[in-house]
Amino acid sequence: MKIAVKNNDNGHLVFDLCQMAAIKRPESIWIPDTYTIVDIKAAFVLIMEKESVLVDMVQQGFLQRYPNSILITAKGYADLNTKYLIREMFRYLPHIPYLYIGDYDPHGIDIFMNYCYGSKMTIYENCDLPFIEFIGVDARDMSLPYSALTPEDINKCQQVLDSPVIYAQSSISASSSFGRLQDMKRQHVIDMIRHMMANNFKCDIESLSVNSKLIPYIDSQLSLIDCRPIN
């Protein structure tokens, strides 16, 4: 698990590492198994599917444009430590956006759902993060580089559609605003998967980075929730 930390007065995260001194570092760092958050400031948290994309964003100056942000990646499917960290951050900062960005393919979407609702293997771990919102990549947003689905992708699409978490009954009342948001989130996932299968294409987020479209794309998505760069 890695986290990109911006060390300034606006967005940073400090850990007390048991017997070690607290740390503040401006680059990506490994988060240990045992820690205590002693200070955290951020306007939003952006969760990346891929480490390579996080590294590209840092190198392209994302943290200079958004010094009040925190970037996290579990390098694919989230391990429990990553999910516990995000849950702990939410305990300190429950009113900021927690956002996910990954591939527009069945694996990227399944990873998002795993963050939000876990899986059959983690049902008793109390680590679901239903407050995380999907901001991309959604190939319906713009003209993106794409490739055809493989037979394995098509099988994965069907697995996602058949997943219990898609149709699971929320413990939150469907009549509540939060319950309705969860229903909308699940429907959004269903719509994306069906769109993917109907059009037989997927989009790798790294293709945006190669074409220098990644930061502008994220800028456009963040602007929808009124998160804007400083330059």
What would you call each of these model-derived segments?
Residues 1-99, 106-231:
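Nucleic-acid enzyme cleavage-core boundary/entry regions
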